[in-house]
C-alpha cells in the first residue's frame, strides 16, 4: 500500500501511519477466514479479520428506500454508515464489506445504488437533490432503532456508489456527513439526470454525452479517503489521483494488486478496515471540547470570537435547526465570531433526541446564559434560533427568570414555522408536522426586548408575515429556508436589530 497523496489536513498523517501498519501485515500470514484467505493461513492478532460473525439484520422502508437492509452491531453502535453499493446492486461483495464495518461497531444502512438511482431519476425535477434523502434516512433509521444519541453518518461507497458518496459530501451542507470512504472512485458518473449543485458540487456534461464528469472542489469540509487499485482498468488510479489531488483534505490509497472489482480482500481489506477506523477516530477527535461540568448534559458547541477592532459586549446562543449543528447554524456562528462575538450552539437534533418541555428548555437556557456571561466576560446575550430552534425559542424566553431576561439584547428567529416540537418522532422524518404547541401565541407574549423575525421570500409557511410589524422587526430576505446561503447578511441583520453593540 502506498499513499499517493495526502493533502493538507491534520488527521491524515495519523491515518497514513495506521493504514501503513495494516498494509505491512497484508501477507500470506494475514489470516483471513475462508473463502477469502488460505485455509492454512495463520492468524494475526494485530490484523483486523474479515467479519465472519453474524450481524443482526432488519428490513425497513422509508421515503425513496424500500425494503432497506440494516445491519446492527452487538451493543451500542459506535458509528453509523450509509453504504452505497456499485451498479450491481446489493450483492455478496457489498454484504461482506458491510459486515466488516459492523465488526468495527458500526450500524450500516445498505443502499442498493441501482434501485436508488432509478428512484431518483424517475422524479420530474430537472436536477437531483439526494443529500436530503440520505440525511433523512439517517435520522429515521437511528430513531427507529432507538439510538441513545444521534451519530453523524459516514458515507461509504463502491464504484458508482463511490462517485455518489463524493457527490453527497460536496452537495450537502458541511458536517451533514462525517466523512466519506470510497473504493474505486471515478469522476465519470453514469447519471441520466444531473445532480443539483447544492453547497458546492460541480460537474460537466460527460464525455460523449454520457452521464456527468464530476469536477473537484477545493475543500469538501469533511475528510474523504479513496482506496484505489493500481490494476483498475475501468478508472485508472492516475485519473482518480489527479482528481483527488485537487481536493483539500482528501487522500488516495494505492493498492498494488487490486482491480476495479475489489475481488481479492487480501489486497484491500486491512487498508479498508484501518481507514474506516481512522476516519471514525478522526470524527471523534474533531468534536469540540466537552462542555463544562455544569453543562455536561447538554449538546453544546463553543465558537470563540475572532479578534475584532472593537469587541462586542455580547455573546450569542444559537439553537440549531432539526438537522443538528451544521450548515446555516455554523455559518451564522462563524459570521458572528468574525465580528468579535463568541457563540454557544445548542445542537437541536441531539437535544430533542429525548423528550423535552418548554420549562426544561428555559431552565437549560438560563444555565447557559448565567455560565457564559461569566465565562466570556460579557454583559448581554443574543438569543437566536433557526428553524426548529426558532420555533422553540419563544417558549424558553417567556419562562426565563427575570435576571436572565434582563440580559437579553435581542431574540432573533429565522425560518420560524407555526408549531413547535420538543421531541423527535419518526413521523418528523416522513412529513411536515402540525402537531405541537402553536408558536404565534408564544412569540406574542414576549415583551421588554426587541424581537427579530427573518424569513425567506420563497418560504410559504413562515410565521413572520403574521406578526405585528409595530411590535416586531420583520425582515424578508431573498431565497427560501436557507436564505440563498447569504449568512453574512443574516449576521448583519441580527446585529442591526439588537440593542446597540460595538460589533457593528
Can you describe what each PLM-predicted range is?
Residues 30-37, 49-76, 270-309:
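N-terminal cap/lid segment of alpha/beta-hydrolase-fold proteins
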Residues 74-104, 306-339, 348:
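Short, surface-exposed "cap/lid" segments of acyl-processing enzymes
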Residues 84-87, 230-233, 257-259, 319, ...:
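Acidic beta-to-alpha connecting loop that harbors the catalytic carboxylate
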Residues 124-147, 355-376, 395:
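Alpha/beta-hydrolase active-site loop
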Residues 190-245, 422-471:
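The feature captures the conserved acid-bearing segment of alpha/beta-hydrolase catalytic domains
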Residues 250-301, 472-504:
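C-terminal catalytic histidine-bearing segment of alpha/beta-hydrolase fold enzymes
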